[in-house]
């Protein structure tokens, strides 16, 4: 592929990623991506075998962008490690998950709808490791012994709850993270009551 062709292909992928962010999988069509990229709709056949390839590339670009944002915030947390307490780590975690190129509601609508599209869900699953790694790095700054998957689930759940109830996502997630961190990380086995005698 020529340099010009590569540039056009990347423009189409960026356009498709933007459409995916704002309108979900149904918004991503060859024609819509070409229109947003100021290219002829017929040109898309030169750069993609089919619609699914374009959709997969758009999803990969989005998950890379989210992981990059989280990674940048993880870098910041590590650079300020000596000054970082639990309160700071909570803020870093929230920023890593709430900072998105698209409006937060659109982002979560996209994630929810992705489950109905195997192409997108596969792309997100494949790229999830980088996001998990960034969250793990932030947790490590304050030696918080929680799996990244658990923390991400708490944050995602808090954001969806807040959006559905018209509450502030940041404040809602902050409360949930504080509750999580306040829980004991290891529970002692429940003691058994001594047997009763007649």
Show which residues each predicted segment covers:
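Helix-turn-helix
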Residues: 11, 19-57
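Solvent-exposed, amphipathic alpha-helical segments
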Residues: 11, 15-22, 68-72, 76, ...
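DNA major-groove recognition helices of helix-turn-helix
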Residues: 51, 61, 131
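Short, basic, alpha-helical segments at the C-terminal edge of helix-turn-helix-like DNA-binding modules
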Residues: 60-67
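Amphipathic alpha-helical packing segments from all-alpha helical-bundle domains
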Residues: 67-70, 98-109, 113-143, 149
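Hydrophobic alpha-helical connector segments
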Residues: 70-103, 148-151
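Hydrophobic/aromatic-rich alpha-helical bundle segments in the mid-to-C-terminal region
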Residues: 120-125, 138-198
């Amino acid at each position: 592929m020529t340099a010009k062709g590569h540039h056009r292909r990347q423009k189409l992928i960026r356009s498709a990623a933007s459409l995916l962010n704002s309108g979900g999988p149904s918004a991503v069509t060859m024609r819509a991506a070409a229109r947003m990229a100021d290219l002829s709709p017929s040109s898309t056949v030169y750069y993609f075998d089919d619609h699914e390839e374009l959709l997969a590339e758009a999803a990969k670009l989005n998950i890379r962008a989210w992981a990059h944002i989280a990674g940048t915030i993880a870098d910041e947390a590590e650079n300020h490690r000596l000054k970082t307490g639990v309160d700071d780590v909570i803020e870093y975690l929230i920023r890593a998950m709430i900072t998105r190129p698209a409006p937060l509601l659109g982002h979560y609508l996209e994630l929810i709808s992705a489950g109905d599209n195997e192409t997108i869900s596969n792309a997100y699953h494949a790229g999830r490791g980088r996001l998990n790694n960034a969250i793990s790095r932030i947790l490590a700054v304050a030696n918080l012994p929680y799996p990244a998957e658990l923390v991400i689930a708490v944050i995602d759940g808090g954001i969806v709850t807040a959006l559905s109830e018209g509450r502030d996502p940041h404040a809602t997630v902050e409360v949930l993270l504080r509750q999580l961190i306040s829980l004991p990380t290891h529970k002692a086995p429940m003691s058994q009551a001594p047997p009763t005698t007649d």
